[in-house]
């Protein structure tokens, strides 16, 4: 009987196993994109726009993208020089 069960044992189909592996790979790639590609370009554009109006050090502009559950929060922090604040008043 062991011989018959060995010969006719239902093994998982290779197509379904390959599909499952591919789904796992795709899910990992999607989760691996924690740092979006657009952040460096956005940082450069913000430096250009802010520099039009206020003389600011590019290192004083910080951008971060945080995920909280199913929400993504884009945090932009710009440290303005003291003389720029005085000019606005």
Curated annotation (Swiss-Prot):
Could you list this entry's UniProt keywords, alphabetically sorted: Cell cycle, Cell division
Q: Name one GO biological process term.
A: regulation of division septum assembly
Q: Which domain of life is it from?
A: Bacteria
- Stretches of the chain forming a coiled coil according to its record: none
InterPro entries assigned to the protein according to its UniProt record, in alphabetical order: MinE (IPR005527), MinE_sf (IPR036707)
Tell whether Cell cycle is among the UniProt keywords.
yes
> What Gene3D superfamilies does this protein's entry cite?
Cell division topological specificity factor MinE
Pfam name, any one: MinE
Q: Does the keyword Cell cycle apply?
A: yes
Record family assignment: Belongs to the MinE family.
Q: What does this protein do?
A: Prevents the cell division inhibition by proteins MinC and MinD at internal division sites while permitting inhibition at polar sites. This ensures cell division at the proper site by restricting the formation of a division septum at the midpoint of the long axis of the cell.
What is the name of this protein? Cell division topological specificity factor
Q: Which organism is it from?
A: Janthinobacterium sp. (strain Marseille) (Minibacterium massiliensis)
